[in-house]
Amino acid sequence: MSETPNLATEAVLVHSAPVPEDAVPVSGIDFDKPENKNTRAADLVGAMNGMGFQATSLGQACNIIDEMRTWEGVDKEGNPAKTTIFLGYTSNLISSGLRSTLKYLVKNKMVSAIVSSAGGIEEDLIKCLAETYLGDFALKGSVLRETGMNRIGNLLVPNDNYCKFEEWVVPILDTMLEEQEKQGVSWTPSTVIDRLGKEIDNEDSVLYWAHKNQIPVFCPALTDGSLGDMLFFHTFKASPLQLKIDIVADIRKINSMSMAATRAGMIILGGGLVKHHIANACLMRNGADYAVYINTGQEFDGSDAGARPDEAISWGKIKAGAKHVKVYADATLVFPLVVAATFAKE
């Protein structure tokens, strides 16, 4: 047989439909070109936009955040309004060096509210008292336990850090209990966090700047970590009195913020509680206008972390016409680049 069989050529050499005029060709970054030398972060991300895969998603995330942070309009009363930006992050990101990037956003009043898990609260405070160190993912747990070293991925936290945290936080809890009993102060997770941010008085702290700039920090699972351990110990120390923390007041507070927003945006690093708490608050206004997810979760197991923005649209947590993207990546790898290309570029 000297000619290619028609069956094969008809299967392989199928003609395409005409390419739409607005189709975007794949492109990359040629560092031989003078304009790509000493590239700024915004230019780098802009060039990555055409690469495909997660590079394109990263570019979309930056475009959405830029629109989110720069939008200006008027509220129902005709007053100037900007996007209410909800920032969510998991505790491991505060344990990592990404804490400095998050602090930058809060210090410069670039977000409106924060949701984190308990570790995201306590680790910020503990880092003001003692260092966290680089380690290795492969370090053996039993050996680390014998030496009093706690592993968070490839980070190491000496257990002495938590002892220092207890010494620092328990007197504050004593004072808060006294204010509850004598002055009738009603504590919520966000007011507890605000008080701790005030007391830490350290400019490296996210919570210090949240207190200073009156940015509420919500943590519906405040007891799920070392701070919960300290609260547990305090119930015995203070018995028969007990510090009471009202979570219902905080759900009203964050939901009310969402409902009052002229536009609402979500920037969520990681998944689980922090992701859903913000999304559910946005449900109260029939969905967010912007959403950027950055995490590595997959949706095949039905997990909240793995769910794409489209699932939140089905629940009314993101508006059907909203601008949204999910970037499948470790936030420590890409979020500094996102911030450099958006919030920090001016």
Swiss-Prot record:
Its EC number is 2.5.1.46. Spermidine binds at E122, E123, D229, H276, G302, S303, D304, E311, A312, I313, S314, W315, G316, K317. GO terms for cellular component: cytoplasm. Disulfide bonds: none annotated. The keyword Glycosyltransferase does not apply. One of its GO terms (molecular function) is deoxyhypusine synthase activity. Pathway: Protein modification; eIF5A hypusination. Pfam families: DS. NAD(+) binds at residues 91-95, 117-119, 123, 224, 271, 296-297, 330-331. The keyword NAD applies. Gene3D superfamilies: Deoxyhypusine synthase (3.40.910.10). It catalyses: [eIF5A protein]-L-lysine + spermidine = [eIF5A protein]-deoxyhypusine + propane-1,3-diamine. GO terms for biological process: spermidine metabolic process. Its cofactor is NAD(+). Keywords: Hypusine biosynthesis, NAD, Transferase. The active site is at K317 (nucleophile). Belongs to the deoxyhypusine synthase family. Catalyzes the NAD-dependent oxidative cleavage of spermidine and the subsequent transfer of the butylamine moiety of spermidine to the epsilon-amino group of a specific lysine residue of the eIF-5A precursor protein to form the intermediate deoxyhypusine residue. This is Deoxyhypusine synthase. It comes from Yarrowia lipolytica (strain CLIB 122 / E 150) (Yeast). The gene is DYS1.
